[in-house]
Amino acid sequence: MTIFEKTGPVNSEETLNIALKTAKERNLDIVVASSEGDTALNLMQKAKEAGFAGKIVCVSCAYGSKTPGENRFSQERRTTLEQNGIRVVTAAHALSGGERGLTKMFGSVHPVELIAYTLRMFGQGTKVCVEVALMALDCGSIS
């Protein structure tokens, strides 16, 4: 297990290296979260260089996560990834989705949000890993 001193994108490079190394050693596929495609493109390049032959699934944010009706992931990046064998999944966030709307409107907390808050106690990255795995599983990209 690796524990980083600081949070955020500063850890992406090392995290991708660890994920690739572990996936190769254990013959695993990789699910990667990528809001705008930068992390997925970086992983794609690293995977090619490392000779990684497993499946890579990229999970992007749902439409409207930043601007109503828009997706932060450009079609150009999606096409590049897909042409290189990476499946791009765009879906409602598994640990917020509809419940977050109810919380905002009625001021209550619902079970799925409690799960998300519990996972965040281990770190935002832990919550994101669980969430994108659920999203990839829900749409049939992994089994």
At which residue positions do the language-model features occur?
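Gly-rich Lys/Arg/Thr-decorated short loops/hinges at beta-loop-alpha junctions or inter-strand turns
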Residues: 1-3, 113-116
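Glycine-rich phosphate-binding "P-loop"
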Residues: 1-20
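General beta-strand structural signal in soluble alpha/beta enzymes
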Residues: 12, 31-34, 58, 88-92, ...
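Short, surface-exposed connector motifs at secondary-structure boundaries
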Residues: 20-29, 52-53
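Gly/Ser/Thr-rich loops at beta-strand to alpha-helix junctions
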Residues: 30-40, 63, 125-129
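Histidine-anchored nucleotide/phosphate-binding helix
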Residues: 37-50
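Long, charge-dense
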Residues: 53-112
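Internal alpha/beta core interface subdomains
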Residues: 115-143
